[in-house]
Amino acid sequence: SLDIKGSEYYTIYIRDIQTKKNITKEITETSGSITFSLDDKYIFYTKLDENHRGRKIYRHEIGNFTNEDELIFEEKSEAFTVSIGLSSDEKYYFINTSDHNTSEQYYFNVDEHKPKPKLIKERQRGILYSVNSWNGKFYNHTNENAEDFKIDIADNLEKPDWKTFIAAKEEVLIGGLTFLKNWIIRGETS
């Protein structure tokens, strides 16, 4: 993606690296962030509104016309902005929507041919959360009942039974997790 005007409205170009020719017509007015499908047939991208907020998530089939792009998710609140990313274990896409102090997240399986994002937990004013998956478990980095955050763990997202994985600590900001093959790295600031 490229922002040639300095406006932070990015244009996405998909180019064949061998022929150096664009495969797809340019996709304009995006956040610039691109998430590829695991089979490299699709990209997911965020369209920006006139207030420069991510509002809609689209799926584009590489090589097809952009007017055929499929709307996957639309954020209705003008106060919130939306983005999409792949889970650490590459089994789910997570759609994140948030303002400065409230968030909400949706997910769908990478194998879904017609993605239908499912809500993880409804937004509650002042509650931030971010779920990721790794090794058959789901990890929730949240400030719910934890001013400086904590990390909970669950076996599924259909009916999650969240258990404490890393408890909140007084005057210690619990950062997120990074997942490696044999390690989980966490960040803390005191």
What are these model-predicted stretches?
Residues S1-S190:
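Peripheral, non-catalytic segments that deliver or gate enzyme domains
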